[in-house]
Swiss-Prot record:
Protein encoded by which gene: yibN
The protein, known as: Uncharacterized protein YibN
Domain Rhodanese: 50-143
Residue positions where N6-acetyllysine is found in the record: K91
Domain of life per record: Bacteria
PROSITE patterns recorded: RHODANESE_3 (PS50206)
GO CC field: cytosol
Keywords: Acetylation
Length: 143
């Protein structure tokens, strides 16, 4: 214990950085464990789409969506979800909803908004459309 105190005394900035990092990891872990939105793999997404008639919500810009999207996807912008302007998605509240974007990094907030709007099962696709395409899974062009 004495060595730890000496280290902290000699390296306060490094010690604060380590404590901040530890707190960030703990908060992130706690949030992911208590979140109603779960991150799923491409295999799990495929199973949900094929077996449970899941609906895919693509958050990318319209041009990116037209260049290639998962078959049957509904294109909604995060701002539309935030404003609760979900249109045709409204009738799918009881089905699993898979939220995707380009990389899977910007999906959590819109997915949480869908959960708050009453959607029962909301998932986020890990690595988004980039991971989907990287595994040579089918993409539909146009529309």
């Amino acid at each position: 214990m004495q060595e730890i105190m000496q280290f902290v005394g000699r390296h306060p900035i490094l010690s604060i950085a380590w404590i901040a990092l530890l707190v960030a990891v703990l908060v992130t872990t706690f949030k992911s464990l208590t979140s109603k939105v779960k991150v799923i793999t491409r295999g799990e997404a495929t199973r949900l789409i094929n077996k449970e008639d899941a609906v895919v919500v693509d958050l990318r810009q319209r041009d990116d969506f037209r260049k290639g999207h998962i078959a049957g996807s509904i294109n909604l912008l995060p701002s539309e979800i935030k404003a609760n302007n979900v249109g045709e998605l409204e009738k799918h509240k009881d089905k699993p909803v898979i939220v995707v974007d380009g990389s899977g990094m910007q999906c959590q907030e819109p997915a949480n908004a869908l959960t708050k709007a009453g959607f029962a099962q909301v998932f986020v696709l890990k690595e988004g459309v980039a991971g989907w395409a990287g595994e040579n899974l089918p993409l539909v062009r146009g529309k």
